[in-house]
Regions:
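Conserved beta-strand signature within the Rossmann-like core of class I S-adenosyl-L-methionine
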Residues: 153-160
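A short glycine-rich, Lys/Arg-flanked "PGG" loop and its adjoining helix->strand segment in the class I
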Residues: 138-152
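S-adenosyl-L-methionine
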Residues: 1-49, 57-64
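Conserved proline-anchored active-site loop of SAM-dependent methyltransferases
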Residues: 117-128
Length: 222
């Protein structure tokens, strides 16, 4: 899967790539000093976070359209993380950073309350076997975490091509009162007939796959 990527020895993530294991130990709860917005030159700007960035195509395409926003991509696969961080560095994209981490764990331990403007969850691993369903990003508990860290009126954007995972999303969203479901609008950088414009989407559009998306807007606590 990673054979087409450049050798790691030719990739430079300096200033753009962060690793969770290299960060100071996390506290019992997220602390201001752990806030990843501090990794940007302008930490006060709206902060968007993508879970599962792969090679970084969405971030590389979307961020120039919204230079007033900061974008953090979290990727678990080391080779993809390095490649995406190097892409951002070579382009001098000051509003993009990449993190190698378990996304849910990082959010729970290090993302402070009401700090995320938008979450992006595109083509997440469906983990189709029943015994692996607990590994799916969207769970009852993670929706509560997303609500904690999303700012008032902020959103969680979800896209998938996997029918069973889509049903899983709908089931969990239906019983979660923390978000209001809204129609999904394609990303600014998406081409006609695309929802996101990722490598994955472009690879499988010719096969006629059905892509579906939803937007969840954070409701204020009652």
């Amino acid at each position: 899967m990673t054979r087409s990527l450049p050798s790691a020895t030719r990739l430079d993530v300096t200033g753009y790539g962060y690793q969770a294991e290299a960060l100071p130990p996390a506290g019992e709860a997220p602390r201001p000093e752990d806030d990843p917005r501090r990794w940007f030159e302008h930490p006060e700007r709206p902060f968007e976070l993508e879970i599962g960035s792969g090679k970084g195509t969405f971030l590389i395409q979307e961020s120039p359209h919204r230079p007033e926003h900061n974008f953090l991509g979290i990727e678990w696969m080391m080779a993809f993380w390095r490649y995406a961080a190097d892409r951002a560095r070579r382009r001098g994209m000051q509003n993009v950073r990449m993190l190698h981490a378990d996304a849910v764990e990082f959010i729970r331990q290090r993302v402070v309350d009401e700090s995320i403007h938008t979450f992006h969850l595109y083509f997440s691993d469906p983990w189709p076997k029943s015994r692996h369903h607990r590994r799916r990003v969207v769970q009852d508990a993670t929706l509560q975490e997303f609500h904690r860290v999303i700012e008032p009126g902020g959103t969680l954007r979800i896209v998938t091509d996997h029918d069973e995972l889509w049903a899983w999303y709908e089931e969990h969203v239906a019983r979660c009162p923390l978000f209001e479901r809204e129609p999904y609008e394609p990303c600014v950088s998406a081409k006609p007939n695309e929802l996101v414009g990722s490598n994955f989407e472009r690879k499988f559009i010719p096969e006629g796959r059905h892509f579906r998306g939803m937007t969840l807007r954070r409701r204020s606590p009652v």
